[in-house]
Amino acid sequence: ALHGGVSRREKFAWLYREVFHREITPEEMEDLCARFVTSALDNVLNAPLVPGIMDVLERWHGRVPLYVCSGTPQAELESVLERRGLARYFTGICGTPPAKAELLKGIVRKERIDPADAVMVGDAPTDSDAAEAAETLFYGRGAFFENASCPHGPDLLGLNAWLEELAAGKD
């Protein structure tokens, strides 16, 4: 997705500014966001999990702090993860606002770790940009990262092996 990881509020504001040549009103913003949630929630709740994610969560849960850092609004993100039975794997669930880079920097500060010891896993340019801004490592998932220099894969089936290599290098 070309604009993956950008908050819907930013997308709606851009649409009104660039296409309709005016600023979106607060009422229009709230209406569009509510309509978006209604139309998208069922799809999100019923979407298949990315291959490999459960193996990653089960292997690393309890060994290292795991966080979700997403452009999805906080309350909605928490609800989706709870309803999908995934929230229990995470030390923290961090949605917007603020932006991903600030969320990631905050996680690194909270955990009192060297950013070089943290890994951001993502599927959008905003994820790799956030990792770069926070100076963390990055693993890309999906077609966008096919030709990227970062470690990546079409899914998360190769993530555990890469993480194990990193962990072995830290011992």
Model-derived features with residue positions:
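Electropositive phosphate-/nucleotide-binding environments in soluble metabolic enzymes
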Residues: 6-9, 153
